[in-house]
């Protein structure tokens, strides 16, 4: 019974099995994946490129930064854009940032360019006979109650009045005198206190800064060329070397003032929350520590006095400008609010104590070195100040913020005595020096301290000592630029991406489509944090923004280059602008060349014939397109992109070969082309030519026949009559008696053929011939189609019967197999049951056997 039940349900199983097999086949076919090219994907890679600058310089101002920026920079964007990249993390390293090196080279170029047209002071490298200029102090009322006379009084020997001999071109030798600061002089003979020379005469070429040029820096923006972008980290507690979770993209940095200073960072950017401590390696005492403050500390610097400026001419267009002292000589100084400074040092000490794991932080003055390092050196309105900061860095703090050192009575402000140098060692390179001409009148500049540069005394932070001594440092201007560029990095945009899809390229006729120009460039990376599926929907917009950004930046660069052309001053920055322009065009053309080689010109999504290899990535489509960003996907397949590109190129070459062979057989590509109106017009023309040819031949032969008959005496114009000719023998009657003598159907013959009659006969015979042949051809075609249809139907019926037969055989085989299996299972089950029964009976009979054994034993 069970076998019969299985046989009855077999048909349902058979149907469900066939459906399952079909579904499996469909799924196996649907899993075929193909490489698809996407243009405009938000992907970038770290890169090094030539940056250009933008500024709002005014060319009519003589400030050196204005002149340099006017020649070198493009105007700033009046509406800068910053695009937040959601769900994007990026690694930054402020200590390995090529932007810092570029800015360092640019500031060197700024100073070199500002000194090129100025006077070289080589004629002054002579022996100077100098005497001290005695100065008197002013009273405390005029100087201010917070500063003592001793603090403002110029030390004896600080300023010297020197005389020397010069011989101008075309004139006799004459003696001149000039006033120099003691820091700018070197004593020649120790035994003679009056013989001096300028400090850099034996090592450097001294160039006097142009008298109408100042050194007040203006903000300069660094911008990336088209095809590149600048990533900005917006994490408020970013230490410079970690993974940033709040990333945005900008085309230019914020305005950076290239302030050249040591120990104290002036007029920079502030930390948004707490004070930030940054160092390449805090445990290495050779690495500087950069402190970014969260609040500014005002520093007010002044050079008092009624100094004047006088010129000493020693050649055509050459003059040395020296100081003319009028009245009292007073020392330059800077003042800082003591409360603000103590609060700043307290916060720095607490932060350093937690980072260095020290309980006591000691701030001490510089340990020695060049004046540029041992003092706070900076430029104030054209004069170079060297201020003693020992009063600033002279305290001890616990890591909880308590001050341990005995502070003197607070006067409200800290006064830093400053010295002024006119011969400056160029910080950027050796062998060069600059003479800063004196500035007349009182000089005052108000600046904001936004950071510190500190050095740690020798020893490792792992020492058992709980004390840590920190001193002011500096000298490497790269640290100044790092303090502003720490949150930026330059990346190269890679708009080409490949990913697997189910779409395969179809060979169809394509129309060329031009890619239009969009708006701005920065929106290109706006979809970087989106999944690949979401980002692929904006490829057109991103590709347009890429090209639009290139065009826009090229226009800006061209305007800057044109400005340099009419000034006839194509500087190093002008060359960089040309490089940026060429680089942007090359990047775009390179991408378009690859798209053209792959047969994807004018497309943002381009399918290919290349099957996706699971060894490249075995992720599922849903996982790729719904869970991954383009950046994550690019990192995963970065090792295989070269292989994929080669396969796409080879596939395109093979496709072009196939298309060429197909075009050679284009006329046979479709039977429907035979029935186009142009083809039928061609057929009609051929038919007319054939018919006309036949008629022409017939006419020629008729004329020849007529000529032949005329020669034989035949007249073609005589009237002839047509007589009926009998169809049978002449003795046969024309009718039949039973039929009432009805005449049979006969045909007439033409006794004499005329010219018109011959033409008519030929046309009639030709039409009849064509009709008969076409009718026969149609009948033959009908018979062939009928025969093929019948044979085809018979073949289909035969195949159907064969399929039914084999299906029935398979069905019978399956039923037989199931029957055999059921019988075998039943027999096996019976055997098992029987064995179990026997085993059970044996167990049940054990007591009986024991009893029988006892009975036999008793007998």
Curated annotation (Swiss-Prot):
Residues 635-669 form a coiled coil. Residues 301-333 are annotated as: V3. A lipid is attached at residue 767 (S-palmitoyl cysteine). Glycans are attached at residues 87, 129, 134, 139, 146, 161, 193, 202, 239, 246, 267, 281, 294, 300, 306, 337, 357, 364, 388, 394, 406, 448, 460, 467, 613, 618, 627, 639. Residues 576-594 are annotated as: Immunosuppression. Residues 366-376 are annotated as: CD4-binding loop. InterPro entries: Gp120_core_sf (IPR036377), Gp160 (IPR037527), GP41-like (IPR000328), HIV1_Gp120 (IPR000777). Residues 461-473, 463-473 are annotated as: V5. A motif (Di-leucine internalization motif) lies at residues 858-859. Residues 708-859 are cytoplasmic. Keywords: AIDS, Apoptosis, Clathrin-mediated endocytosis of virus by host, Cleavage on pair of basic residues, Coiled coil, Disulfide bond, Fusion of virus membrane with host endosomal membrane, Fusion of virus membrane with host membrane, Glycoprotein, Host cell membrane, Host endosome, Host membrane, Host-virus interaction, Lipoprotein, Membrane, Palmitate, Signal, Transmembrane, Transmembrane helix, Viral attachment to host cell, Viral envelope protein, Viral immunoevasion, Viral penetration into host cytoplasm, Virion, Virus endocytosis by host, Virus entry into host cell. Residues 130-161 are annotated as: V1. GO terms for biological process: clathrin-dependent endocytosis of virus by host cell; fusion of virus membrane with host endosome membrane; fusion of virus membrane with host plasma membrane; positive regulation of plasma membrane raft polarization; positive regulation of receptor clustering; viral protein processing; virion attachment to host cell. Highly glycosylated by host. The high number of glycan on the protein is reffered to as 'glycan shield' because it contributes to hide protein sequence from adaptive immune system. Palmitoylation of the transmembrane protein and of Env polyprotein (prior to its proteolytic cleavage) is essential for their association with host cell membrane lipid rafts. Palmitoylation is therefore required for envelope trafficking to classical lipid rafts, but not for viral replication. Gene3D superfamilies: 1.10.287.210, Human immunodeficiency virus 1, Gp160, envelope glycoprotein (2.170.40.20), Single helix bin (1.20.5.490). HAMAP family: HIV_ENV. This is Envelope glycoprotein gp160. It comes from Human immunodeficiency virus type 1 group M subtype A (isolate MAL) (HIV-1).
